[in-house]
């Protein structure tokens, strides 16, 4: 069994399959797990209230919300159930709120509640002037987008799934014995079953198998991360009334204690265009000025860009081809993080129907990821951790309070940090106010020593020692 794509969906599928007596390979073109679309989103665990009723996405997002809400705390994935307010800014939007609540009810979500303008401003005193009312969605939550795919991949690996990175799938050949031969940028892989969870490139992989049911058009979303001093400005996830194109620009806290503004929504052709744009950031500032005016007086910590795998269809594109022993998971947009575990369940059922024999293992090992969220104690705050290993009391990244012990643990993990980017997602090092200006030298030295690499090699530079 080969799973192409080690994003949050592919990793969730690998974790699901790891419960059975199968030989599985999780393969990705990138240098790390969750390094594509999965790392750059709004980091919200969606309740599914606004999905289109009757769609596969609606069903899997609702199921995924329940699964991930239960799995997350046990696996160490930071989740904060702070709720959301869907804010109406004019009479037309206000009139749309009852219909949105009815839509939520058709999706099985019955907790949506209309609130008047007075209650809205009591809940959010820093909200910009002119709001007319809101819909309260209590089950929208914050989640760490980095830890979720890492937890899935880690649990898959400790239960026997092989992980192969830096392996772009360039071709598919049929072998006389009925196996698929995946030609990658590193080697060839033989697999009886193949699951395509390649995200932005799912359509390209699908065409290698002879199908053309959808085309992925990258939808660029730019976001601005504000300093932690801005966090008290907002108490809920502040959502706009959605459009047909996008859920719109929101203001939301993060599990790291920042505030984020975004995303934009721009369909583009280039699947690698993750640079921010002046026009995009200007648009966000204009919208942010109306949403929470005081936010624009706060310092910006970072800007990032994510590409969502939009297609011409209004639903997930999940298809099973039993004769080929092939499954395609495409068109998984901004709800993919929430739906990931339910998508994995759905794929398992489809593979079983396609003839895959599943025998459950006697043991399925659990994992607990190191906490990088602010709602629970961090290692530098834990006397027991420091007593057991003094490195957990030695802070290296002072903006984010990341310790030497966390960095070394990330390098030694079952799915280890292999780069500074990978270390950021596992520990928060270099993600703070100074963006590594003060700590990058020490963090890089620690990572290079722990990996047994020169700094030049780690950074992809010519090795000056040779």
Residue ranges and their predicted role:
Residues 272, 403-413, 437-455:
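Iron-sulfur (Fe-S) cluster-binding segments and ferredoxin-like electron-carrier domains
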Residues 43-123, 248-249:
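Dinucleotide-binding Rossmann-like beta1-alpha1 core, especially the glycine-rich loop
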Residues 12, 172-262, 266-276, 286, ...:
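Flavin-dependent oxidoreductases
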